[in-house]
Amino acid sequence: MTQETARETTPGSAPIPHWPGRMVSVGDHEVFVRSAPDPKTPDHAEPALCVHGLEGSSRNWTDLMDLLRTQLACDALDLPGFGDSPPRPDGRYSIAALAQTVIALIEKRQNPVHLIGNSLGGAVSLKVAATRPELIQSLTLISPALPDLHPRLDLVRFPVVGLPRVGPRLIRQYQAALPPERRVAAVIATCYSNPGLYPQARFAAEVAELNRRDSLEYAAAALMGSARALSAEFLRKGRHSPWRDAARVVAPTLVIYGQRDRLVDPRAAGRAAHMFREARIVVLPRTGHVAQMERPDLVAAEIGILLGIPGGFGRLTQERAGEADTQSVQH
């Protein structure tokens, strides 16, 4: 095991625009997929696919994709019912159903991918890697939503939103009590270790996006269904436990936790080290629940180490490489 201490990063002066996207057919439904092209990226660049967390979207990957696109052909999807993706026709939001959507998208590309998932997207990505190993070149999980012996209070309370009759009422009360500006600010405060690192130039756009989401008939159902799915996943025991899925993963794996994550306890890193066959486990100091947004340079550096890319993903990430508390495990 090696341990080193990270220094603070400096947020950029102006955020880049979100990447353009398109609707992609995956069987009986469609998903919205953003791509980050780079004219310098080789035509044979290996594909990467990013999967967002609960109530997130492909917009959560903008800055990390900007760093990875120099070496990888980066895509990020909106899971069904989130972002710009319509819901699945069957209305299912289970981890298995969401994993089916991701699998269909990867199969459409006809090449195995470097799969990267955050929170709910981490649970979905783990399911994909465990059940369809031939589709995965590497797996990166950022604060994955997996059963925890020390669950954070916010994560314990949140599945209540998934309860029939109770969930819709709570959502309506929340929307009525707090205007979109305050709700966006609350999400940032919860998910970031240092909310001051959030690019304020993006704040108005996120408020507008939340207003749009509030007007969609299926948005509340997507939130409730996904919350219910996470709650059910946490209760799975024995051979059906997500941690058993972790033991089945054969792809090179990177698991990143945030030292100041308010939703996923970083002490889960110990269990991750025990359950994955071959993994690099990283705890990023001064980092919250969305490391790919708050510390994209550090995340890109760690992915560069995982993939063995010479020089990492540019000068900045090369300087950051190895700055986190890390341990490598091989069973």
Task: Describe every region a protein language model picked out.
Residues H29-P86, M293:
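Conserved HGGG/HGGXW glycine-rich cap/lid loop of the alpha/beta-hydrolase fold
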Residues A96-V113:
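Conserved acidic catalytic loop of the alpha/beta-hydrolase fold
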Residues F234-K237, R260-V264:
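Acidic catalytic loop of the alpha/beta-hydrolase fold
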Residues V249, V255-Y257:
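Short beta-strand/loop motif that positions the catalytic acidic residue
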Residues L263, L284-A300:
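Catalytic histidine-centered segment of alpha/beta-hydrolase-like enzymes
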